Amino acid sequence: MSASREKNKRKEEAAAPAAANEAKKGMSKGLKTTLIAVCAVLIVCIVVFFYMLTSGFFASHTTAATVGTHKLTPAMVNYFYKGAYGNMQNQYGDFMSYVIDSDTPLDEQVYDEESGETWADYFTDQGLINASNAYALYDAAKADGHTLSEDEQASIDSQISSLALYASYYGTNTSGYIAGVYGTGCNEKNFREYLEVVTLADSYATATQNGFIYTDEQIASEYAANPNSYDAVTYRQFLVSDAMFQTDSTDTEDDDAEAEAETLSDEELTALKEELASKMAADTQRDEQAFIDQAYENCLESAKETYAEDSATLKENQLYSSLSTDVADWLFDAGRAEGDTTYIATDSVYYVLYFVSRSTNDYQLPNVRHILFSVSDTTDETAMDEARTKAEDVLTEYEAGDKTAESFGELAKEYTADSNGDEGGLYENIMPGQMVTEFNDWCFDADRKPGDTGIIETSYGVHVMYFDSFGKIYRDALVENALRSADYNAWYDATAGDGSYTTSAFGMKYTTK
């Protein structure tokens, strides 16, 4: 190899590493820039994701369930979930604690042992069924041109305002308070939407129900076809039970009696009940006083004080629907006559019955106004005395005026603590047993006439009463209610649907339980 060629080779070899280094240096710069950009994007995405996660974005923007054509966000599902829980709470009241442990999360409390379903699952299901029904009615209302009344819209605004007041008290804003109560993603906007849906649905359902009107001919035809459904019976009843043939410490005068009660077989107890019931029915036929006397003689010693009253066995104006089938069928038999007696066996007791009378319920129902002075604890005599004084003062004010229904109504608007103040304290077509006993007895007093006034006391406080007028025939009201109920139920089933829904596993993750 010549000297020149060797020199050139060394130059090429020296140049090669330099070129490689230049190439390497250029790739590192580009890669570094790319990596920085990718990392920046990832960081932004992570920040945005966690913001969306913690701010309730997913709870208010994803789909958790679908009812009909409506996609419900997790936040909307939360509202119906809480609504289902509230419905049960209203139904059970103080007994709710016997069903659900308030100190344990609902998704940790089993509702159905066989399926493993929790109470959280139950309320989710009930809430979504309610949502399906509500949105179906909401859509029907929209299609029918039904809108919220001014009062209904004002009620929604009032609920929002109340939450704003609570929020202010707790040092937060309205949406923050709503989220705290109902769950992440819940805010003032979607809560108002929820209220508008359920309020319009309820309003439309109520308007539809009230819209079913019936003619006198329709009412008469229904009564003629089903008189047992609308008549009432008065009768006497005595129950023969196992306890009457077993020794009980409360029914013996022997203080030294320590022996256990004699144990009788089921067959022996049944035979004894049959014997007593059949004898009492046979011995008291056509003799109401004999029935009263034998009830007293046969009852437990611990019940003697109760059965000393003639009214102990009396059942007045009972409807067929309020009785067991066997008892109702005998009492409402077309051939039943006053003084008829019988006995009817059930699994646990024997009914001894004495038929008194049957009524066609063809009397008028009372329309009554009242002014309530509410007392939270009616055992508090100081509070009751204050309420009595106020009631007497208002009655005096009424009597000093023109003493009309209208003037009483104006006083009711001013003074009553009842929710019907805007209607002048008026209750129309009051059904027997609709009101508490004292209120009911005053309304249905046989001597009551329009213009009568009085003061009564109930568990609600002190009432100033005014008998306004007589309303519908009771029988006709019963028939109307039955027809309306049947027609409304048919309409509701057809309009509200079957409560079907679908859920999205991803969206349901963001619901609050």
Briefly describe each language-model feature range.
Residues 8, 12, 18-39, 46-60, ...:
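PPIase-associated folding chaperone regions across multiple families
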Residues 56-189:
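N-terminal targeting/tethering segments
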Residues 73-74, 85-91, 95, 245-251, ...:
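Short, solvent-exposed loop/turn elements at domain surfaces
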Residues 81-84, 88, 131, 135, ...:
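Sec/Tat-exported extracytoplasmic proteins
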Residues 98, 122, 159, 177, ...:
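Charge-rich, solvent-exposed alpha-helical interaction surfaces
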Residues 151, 155, 214, 218, ...:
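Alpha-helix N-cap and coil->helix boundary residues
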Residues 275-327, 393-437, 468:
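Peptidyl-prolyl cis-trans isomerase
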